[in-house]
Curated annotation (Swiss-Prot):
Protein name, entry field: Serine--tRNA ligase
Functional note: Catalyzes the attachment of serine to tRNA(Ser). Is also able to aminoacylate tRNA(Sec) with serine, to form the misacylated tRNA L-seryl-tRNA(Sec), which will be further converted into selenocysteinyl-tRNA(Sec).
UniProt comment concerning the protein's domains: Consists of two distinct domains, a catalytic core and a N-terminal extension that is involved in tRNA binding.
Species for this entry: Nitrobacter hamburgensis (strain DSM 10229 / NCIMB 13809 / X14)
Localization, UniProt: Cytoplasm
Domain of life per record: Bacteria
GO terms classed as biological process: selenocysteine biosynthetic process; seryl-tRNA aminoacylation
Enzyme Commission number(s) from the entry: 6.1.1.11
GO MF assignments: ATP binding; serine-tRNA ligase activity
Reactions this protein catalyses: tRNA(Ser) + L-serine + ATP = L-seryl-tRNA(Ser) + AMP + diphosphate + H(+); tRNA(Sec) + L-serine + ATP = L-seryl-tRNA(Sec) + AMP + diphosphate + H(+)
Length: 470
């Protein structure tokens, strides 16, 4: 979410940044909405102020026994009382119109981000390792897994449809080992706090990290009818004063729906643990002495992949359900850039220990995510992909500035005592399913078996090679 005051102060800079994103200028239309919003709010505030003043004057007139003046003032108050709800509604509608318009606009790129229109404008930052030489033609993971009998797409299709997989025996254990290894490194060495978050979240959480409203079609959601008792339970939780700050709770809004026998609530399956982890600080004022906060989670993730029709239809590269280790940092504005570099190095470290060849790309303005100011992609080498192998994304590490914090109302208080918005960062540390693919294709042997990387041996119960039936 953008700061309308910043747009007001420098509309040309805002439009110039949007141009780098490939978007038309928007400052004029936003400022026009803002002007109407401010006028509506001012009119509402002036009406309230006049009503308060007139009410006080009524008492003074009656005290002075000026009945005519008292009657005139009472008529004025009655008229204001009649017109004010409409004025308040107009102010609220104008505010919501601006909020909706701002919510549709992506974050602005940092100055050092390269300009470009798509992935062809990305710049290679650095490379780790080298491509391995094989005395045979490397096979893709789906062929390896199928021959082992441990990767079953047909059974998954019967259960759930396309873009799902059933893993068994050695491959199921190998995927579990990879995820556990990633978590152990990030929590034990990199200082991240492990979190086991809900996999279902509400609209506000998805809005906070900017999956909504723009990317609703890429998500899985469902509607649940909540009974009166369920609604009451939720209302009681939200009334708890430890969770409610002044100005953030509308009793009428909470109680009115209870008159209905049921209410439809929508929940979303998380597309990434970034959503619950980042929203842990929503509607909070943190002590800056506690920052940075670093969270990590190993979770299933769910994506509809609405725009991926026809792409990566074979194998596990693009699934509706996949496992990922997520890294999230909450920082001050002064430290977010350094934290971004640190997060990248943490994601790289687990791949280095697996001895996987990869490259790091700095994404251009046309290829960055909606909420990102700057993104590094880690692309791991998969020797069985395409003709002769291919680099495939296994991690994206992004710094978002205060873009998500404004949507979540997440702030911190520094030495001067004034609250300000925190900066948020997120990255994959890394995608476990794609790491499994990279390990399978990199460590495959001529007989179709897969050697287990040394760092994963402690997690494999003595299994050193995954072969058919093991």
């Amino acid at each position: 979410m953008h700061d309308i005051k910043a747009i007001r102060d420098n509309p040309a800079a805002f439009d110039a940044a949007l141009k780098r994103r490939g978007l038309a200028p928007l400052s004029s239309s936003l400022l026009a909405i803002d002007e109407k919003r401010r006028a509506a709010i001012l009119a509402s505030e002036q009406a309230q102020a006049r009503r308060n003043a007139a009410s006080k004057e009524i008492g003074e007139a009656k005290k002075a026994k000026d009945e005519a003046r008292a009657a005139k003032l009472m008529a004025e108050v009655a008229e204001l009382k009649t017109s004010m709800p409409e004025m308040d509604a107009a102010a609220k509608a104008a505010d919501e119109k601006l909020r909706k318009a701002l919510a549709e606009i992506p974050n602005l790129p940092l100055d050092e981000v390269p300009d470009g229109t798509d992935e062809h404008g990305n710049i290679q930052h650095h490379v780790f390792g080298k491509k391995r030489d094989y005395a045979f033609t490397p096979k893709p993971h789906e062929d390896l897994g199928g021959a082992l009998g441990d990767m079953d797409f047909e059974a998954a299709a019967k259960l759930s449809g396309a873009r799902f997989v059933v893993l068994k025996r050695g491959l199921a254990r190998l995927e579990r080992a990879i995820g556990q290894f990633f978590l152990d490194v990030h929590t034990g060495e990199h200082g991240y706090t492990e979190v086991n978050p809900p996999l279902l979240v509400r609209d506000d959480a998805m809005f906070g990290t900017a999956q909504l409203p723009k990317f609703a079609e890429d998500q899985f959601d469902f509607i649940k009818d909540r009974t009166i008792s369920e609604q009451l339970e939720q209302t009681v939780v939200e009334i708890d004063q430890r969770k409610v700050r002044p100005g953030h709770f509308d009793m009428e809004q909470k109680v009115t729906p209870l008159s209905a026998p049921t209410r439809k609530d929508r929940l979303w399956l998380i597309p990434t643990a970034e959503v619950p982890l980042t929203n842990l600080v929503r509607e909070s004022i943190l002590d800056e002495k506690e920052l940075p906060l670093r969270f990590t989670a190993l979770t299933p993730c769910f994506r509809a992949e609405a725009g991926a029709a026809g792409r990566d239809t074979r194998g596990m590269i693009r699934q509706h359900q996949f496992t990922k280790v997520e890294l999230v940092s909450i920082t001050t504005p002064e430290t977010s850039k350094d934290e971004h570099e640190r997060m990248l190095s943490c994601a790289e470290e687990v791949l280095r220990r697996l001895d996987l060849h990869y490259r790091v790309m700095t994404l251009c303005t046309g290829d960055m995510g909606f909420a990102s100011q700057k993104t590094y992609d880690i692309e791991v080498w998969m020797p069985g992909q395409g003709e002769g192998g291919a680099y495939r994304e296994i991690s994206s590490c992004s710094v978002c500035g205060d873009f998500q914090a404004r949507r979540m109302d997440a702030r911190s208080r520094g030495p001067d005592g004034k609250p300000r918005f925190v900066h948020t960062l997120n990255g994959s540390g890394t995608a476990v399913g794609r790491a499994l693919i990279a390990v399978m294709e990199t460590y495959q042997q001529a007989d179709g078996s897969i050697a287990v990387p040394d760092v994963l041996l402690p997690y494999m119960g003595g299994l050193k090679v995954i072969a058919k039936g093991l």
